Amino acid sequence: MKTKQKIFFAKIIYRLIRIFFPKKIRVKRRGIEWSLNLSEAIDLHIFVFGSFEIKITNVAKKLHLEKYNQIIDIGANFGVQSLQFAKNFTNSKIYSVEPTNYAFNKFIKNLELNQKLSRNIHPFQIFLGSKEKAIPTSIYSSWN
């Protein structure tokens, strides 16, 4: 399916859901509590399908990531992969890196909703890069 078609269907789904549900909602999907904003694509996907990029978690299971005691989630966004990893790899420590204020604050809120899972997640609001230089005062996500 082409991107334009996906966007078209997402708009229809969003409009239908908004008839019955508020824009901001707290839900439980696949054993994880989420604070979602249904006007955002990833949030809407989790609300409708229960997860986002579940293929990453499935590949991690096939690679037997549980035998490793540390997982690094770079570009953690609001914790989608970190929380799924914590749920599936209970003996691993997850180090999550997210530079943007908006996503990081949302990540912290989702960790607070998942106290048991958050014990193994260590969030860091930092930038990773190949050069040492000053960090801009305002940082925006490309999708925000």
Q: Residue spans of the language-model regions?
A:
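Phosphate/nucleotide-binding beta-alpha loop and adjacent structural elements of enzyme active sites
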Residues: M1-N144
